[in-house]
Amino acid sequence: MLNNEYKNSSLKIFSLKGNEALAQEVADQVGIELGKCSVKRFSDGEIQINIEESIRGCDVFIIQPTSYPVNLHLMELLIMIDACKRASAATINIVVPYYGYARQDRKARSRKPITAKLVANLIETAGATRMIALDLHAPQIQGFFDIPIDHLMGVPILAKHFKDDPNINPEECVVVSPDHGGVTRARKLADILKTPIAIIDKRRPRPNVAEVMNIVGEIEGRTAIIIDDIIDTAGTITLAAQALKDKGAKEVYACCTHPVLSGPAKERIENSAIKELIVTNSIHLDEDRKPSNTKELSVAGLIAQAIIRVYERESVSVLFD
């Protein structure tokens, strides 16, 4: 626990159904109890939210990743924002560890929607005054909002794990980006670990189907660490791991901030060349979706620090610079 000076303050933290364990951990780190609210569903599927304490004049923080089931968790968030606005909260700060629809951030083809922008519009219209996000799939999504966005990074948490692991020598590692779009992320991890980087050139013939083509960088004899922001069906990451093994990698580790792990992901990872998968708890991961070789790291401390700094009107940039 960081401190207990906020127990009788106007700081309120609420959790919806998206990741209650993470929200509780964040509240414990801040040193306050979670706010009292109920989230129920009517028989026809409609959501009913009731805030069970006064929040008039309070700085409210709502923790809710919009992960699976995405639409249900998004509606919970929008309804809670509206409830806080009508209950006269001073500020409504949403903490979104995982931003659903982030991969629909541009018009890849004619007549396609930009759903990431639509979600931003919905959040703002509902009444949110600030968003704390973690590793947005595309950083430019921040530009879809007219409210302040604090964009936290998961790379330092992942990097600390590899630096502290006695079985890994960073001097013998290479950080690998599974595609060209992830080079910036891979470079950040490589800078912290002081390792070289490599890039996998992949082609995706259709959604959720990836084909690894070739590898740019020195791999042979090194421990490869693949880093991505999201692992969904795990097609990309497992094909990348096998390609690295074929190129002479000694061992292959994989890491990501957001373990979506849908469909065949669990089976693919367990049967792949990946020795260990390191993820964060930005998304609640049921045991039946978690591969047996998974290590989960907590982002609660990072989020708790961000909440305290926002509440105290202090700079948040020290957390992601």
Swiss-Prot record:
Gene3D superfamilies membership: 3.40.50.2020
InterPro entries: PRib_PP_synth_CS, Pribosyltran_N, PRibTrfase_dom, PRTase-like, Rib-P_diPkinase, Rib-P_diPkinase_bac
Primary localisation category: cytoplasm
Catalytic activity line of the entry: D-ribose 5-phosphate + ATP = 5-phospho-alpha-D-ribose 1-diphosphate + AMP + H(+)
Recorded metabolic or biological pathway in which this protein acts: Metabolic intermediate biosynthesis; 5-phospho-alpha-D-ribose 1-diphosphate biosynthesis; 5-phospho-alpha-D-ribose 1-diphosphate from D-ribose 5-phosphate (route I): step 1/1
Residues involved in D-ribose 5-phosphate binding: 204, 228, 232-236
UniProt KW ATP-binding keyword: yes
Active site, UniProt feature: 202
Binding-site residues for Mg(2+) 1, renumbered to this chain: 137
Matches recorded under Pfam families: Pribosyl_synth, Pribosyltran_N
GO BP term, example: purine nucleotide biosynthetic process
Cofactor remark: Binds 2 Mg(2+) ions per subunit.
Keywords: ATP-binding, Cytoplasm, Kinase, Magnesium, Metal-binding, Nucleotide biosynthesis, Nucleotide-binding, Transferase
Main enzyme class: transferase
Subcellular location: Cytoplasm
Sites where the protein binds ATP: 44-46, 103-104
Residues annotated for Mg(2+) 2 binding in this entry: 179
GO cellular component: cytoplasm; ribose phosphate diphosphokinase complex
CC cofactor: Mg(2+)
Assembly and binders: Homohexamer.
Family named by the database record: Belongs to the ribose-phosphate pyrophosphokinase family. Class I subfamily.
Biological function: Involved in the biosynthesis of the central metabolite phospho-alpha-D-ribosyl-1-pyrophosphate (PRPP) via the transfer of pyrophosphoryl group from ATP to 1-hydroxyl of ribose-5-phosphate (Rib-5-P).
UniProt protein name: Ribose-phosphate pyrophosphokinase
Chain's gene name: prs
